[in-house]
């Protein structure tokens, strides 16, 4: 990679760069970086800032849920899946954990600042890289572009919304259908809109048929804004996310969010009981119970919907730029 090193050093010197922000999680310096060590960058001394976009702690914690093989039709295929899940998957998880801890230790050693997307992300980084100085870590969320005006209360309908990629391994849309089978059948006037496309679209439509869900529509890939405006409740059922931009997007539109309490940033995005609801990780029965309560309790839902836009404003581009400016100047 000498060509890459020479090019980057030349560019940094010519541009008189003060700060280099690495959005690749260790792609500039470290074991998998352009530079193996920080000393190789001495010709172009810059402040190095690494940005963590995902929740690696949650990715490791729920590794088995994301990578588990399922759905084989034949007996031999089911046997292969069983052997992989029982024998290979635990080994792969241990290797992934070792690699991630090695990467985080190198980030802590080679970078001046490490930016996570949430306060909880800072804590998780230190769990994987113990001894990381607290002053090296900062939490700056992703920005949420503002909307012109939130919908009026009379625009809201009895609709629950999902927006995202139809990928069960991470997004858990199959969980949502099972949850809806518990909650939605009790209130047939309510409707679930699923906006998005992905590799599991056909399987999800088959699951909806098996569960005999009549008040569900698969909308495909669409502009979600009109759906946010008319929906009253937003459901995210992901195994984990890096941030979860759809949650503050929903709050901007007075659409009350629900999610599993399964990753760090969600606890910054949703204040339980005030701006939305967090269910215990992957407890579908409790999620359905809370969803049913939210659909039935108009005053509770209205109070959360009114609190949402103000909380979502914390993630405005202006606030995020202000935090970045503060970090870069110190």
Residue ranges of each PLM-predicted region?
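A short, well-ordered alpha-helix in the C-terminal region of glycosyltransferases
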Residues: 286, 293, 300-314, 323-326
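Aromatic "clamp/platform" in nucleotide-sugar-dependent glycosyltransferases that forms part
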Residues: 239
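Conserved donor-binding/catalytic core segment of Leloir-type glycosyltransferases
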Residues: 148, 152-171, 177-180
């Amino acid at each position: 990679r000498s060509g890459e090193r020479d090019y980057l050093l030349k560019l940094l010197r010519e541009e008189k760069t003060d700060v280099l922000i690495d959005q690749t999680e260790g792609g500039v310096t470290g074991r998998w970086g352009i530079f193996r060590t920080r000393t190789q960058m001495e010709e172009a001394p810059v402040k190095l800032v690494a940005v963590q976009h995902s929740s690696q702690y949650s990715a490791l914690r729920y590794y088995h849920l994301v990578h588990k093989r399922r759905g084989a039709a034949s007996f031999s295929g089911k046997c292969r899946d069983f052997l992989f899940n029982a024998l290979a998957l635990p080994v792969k998880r241990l290797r992934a954990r070792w690699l991630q801890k090695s990467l985080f230790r190198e980030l802590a050693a080679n970078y001046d600042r490490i930016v996570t997307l949430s306060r909880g992300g800072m804590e998780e980084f230190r769990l994987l890289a113990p001894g990381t100085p607290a002053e090296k870590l900062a939490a700056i969320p992703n920005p949420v572009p503002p909307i012109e005006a939130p919908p009026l209360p009379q625009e809201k309908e009895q609709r629950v919304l999902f927006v995202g990629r139809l990928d069960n391994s991470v997004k858990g849309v199959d969980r949502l259908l099972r949850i809806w089978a518990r909650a939605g059948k009790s209130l047939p006037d309510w409707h679930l809109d699923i906006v998005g496309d992905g590799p599991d679209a056909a399987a999800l439509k088959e699951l909806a048929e098996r569960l005999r869900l009549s008040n569900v529509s698969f909308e495909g890939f669409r502009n979600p804004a009109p759906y946010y405006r008319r929906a009253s409740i937003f459901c995210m059922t992901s195994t984990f996310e890096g941030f979860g931009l759809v949650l503050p997007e929903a709050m901007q539109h007075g659409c009350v969010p629900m999610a599993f309490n399964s990753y760090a940033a969600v606890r910054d995005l949703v204040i339980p009981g005030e701006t939305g609801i967090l269910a215990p990780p992957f407890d579908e029965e409790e999620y359905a119970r809370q969803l049913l309560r939210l659909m039935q309790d108009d005053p509770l839902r209205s109070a959360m919907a009114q609190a949402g836009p103000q909380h979502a404003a914390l993630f405005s581009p202006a606030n995020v730029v202000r935090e970045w400016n503060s970090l870069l100047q110190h």
